């Protein structure tokens, strides 16, 4: 049995980015043969990636990139908030955002097929899964290309906003993006609010108003009032500016001689059902697995 030295482990780690203990195990199994150990490790990491790729990803980050006349916002997911802070994961997310802005892929599948680091985006993603031991997925992205201005805002990497706007004052774009992150409007104006959201709000308002026992004409006015209030609350232009409660966003923009054309808001994990771990069951499963080894 060949002696496994620290320098051998370090060399294998430098080649594969695998954890130190995994490198040592592979070298031991390969009897000190570095090339064989690397092959064993790549197979092992590949298997690790395939197992991880089926797990729920409800944590992650939002990353942004603006360059020239294009900007992008992307959401990448992982399984834990610990990995969401991992340097390699964060670097990959930034690279993906830049690729979206510069290459204009049609969808996530097209993005995944783009060349990256001598391979493809998806191959790099799978290698990252093998390295960190968690599933990593590119969930969604949005790209703006315009002769107007683009502003982005990230709040703790979990909330991201991209805004297309006009006007000379770049602070306006930053302020609007920050406001969107804080107040989370669903549309630019009342007219842009999706019909299904309005219908839902109207049904809720009708049920509440019906319980009041008031005459039908009064109930109808109550319902209309509730719907109008809702539309103002969820449309960007009608919202009260978070930095000045004496102005709406529309008034602030008018004073700055600016307009907002469109925006997008991403919140990490929005709509994804997080896995609920049963700690006792997890420990029992680990014990059972250990007995089988």
Curated annotation (Swiss-Prot):
Domain of life per record: Bacteria
One annotated GO molecular function: translation elongation factor activity
Position of the signal peptide: none
Key words of the record: Cytoplasm, Elongation factor, Protein biosynthesis
InterPro entries: EF-Ts_dimer_sf, Transl_elong_EFTs/EF1B, Transl_elong_EFTs/EF1B_dimer, Transl_elong_Ts_CS, UBA-like_sf
Family: Belongs to the EF-Ts family.
HAMAP family: EF_Ts
PANTHER family to which the protein is assigned, alphabetical: ELONGATION FACTOR TS (PTHR11741), ELONGATION FACTOR TS, MITOCHONDRIAL (PTHR11741:SF0)
Name under which the protein is recorded: Elongation factor Ts
Lineage: Bacteria, Pseudomonadati, Pseudomonadota, Betaproteobacteria, Burkholderiales
Gene (name only): tsf
């Amino acid at each position: 049995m060949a002696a496994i030295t620290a320098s051998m482990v370090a060399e294998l780690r430098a080649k594969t980015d695998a954890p130190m203990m995994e490198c040592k195990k592979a070298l031991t199994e390969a009897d000190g043969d570095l090339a064989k150990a690397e092959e064993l490790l790549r197979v092992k990491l590949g298997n690790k990636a395939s197992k991880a790729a089926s797990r729920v990803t409800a944590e992650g980050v939002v990353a942004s990139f603006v360059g020239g006349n294009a900007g992008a916002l992307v959401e990448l997911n992982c399984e834990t908030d610990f990995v969401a802070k991992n340097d390699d994961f964060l670097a990959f997310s930034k690279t993906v955002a830049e690729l979206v802005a510069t290459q204009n892929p049609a969808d996530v599948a097209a993005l995944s097929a783009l060349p990256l680091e001598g391979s493809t985006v998806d191959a790099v993603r799978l290698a990252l899964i093998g390295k960190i031991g968690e599933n990593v997925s590119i969930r969604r992205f949005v790209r703006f290309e315009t002769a107007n201005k683009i502003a982005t805002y990230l709040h703790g990497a979990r909330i991201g906003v991209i805004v297309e706007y006009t006007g000379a004052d770049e602070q306006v774009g930053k302020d609007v993006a920050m406001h969107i992150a804080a107040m989370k409007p669903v549309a630019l104006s009342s007219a842009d609010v999706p019909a299904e959201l309005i219908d839902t709000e109207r049904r809720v308002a009708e049920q509440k108003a019906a319980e009041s026992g008031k005459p039908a004409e009064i109930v109808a006015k109550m319902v209309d009032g509730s719907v109008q209030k809702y539309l103002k609350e969820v449309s960007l232009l009608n919202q009260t500016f978070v930095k000045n409660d004496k102005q709406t966003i529309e008034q602030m923009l008018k004073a700055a001689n600016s307009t907002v054309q469109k925006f997008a808001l991403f919140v990490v994990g929005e709509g994804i059902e997080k896995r609920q771990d049963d700690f006792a069951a997890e420990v029992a499963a680990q014990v059972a697995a250990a007995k089988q080894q």
